[in-house]
Amino acid sequence: MGQAGKALREVLTSYGISQNKLATAMGLPRSAVYKWVHEERDPTALTVVGIVKALRGMNSEAAEAFIRLYLGEPTENED
């Protein structure tokens, strides 16, 4: 457990976004975001998409940072 939670915690801290603000933007209770950030529960793939959309609405750099931290850096396909 935890890759999404770790990435989300780092992004929220780095960009000054509160758990409550993200939860409100997603239409979810703050407790859901708390559980992801504290690695008590992993968000589903569909929820990760919702996290990215909500972050983009607040700060596009935060959304890109979350994607990068969660998925890692893209690698070039070497032939």
Each model region followed by its residue ranges:
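Short, charged recognition helix plus adjacent turn
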Residues: G16, K35, E61-D79
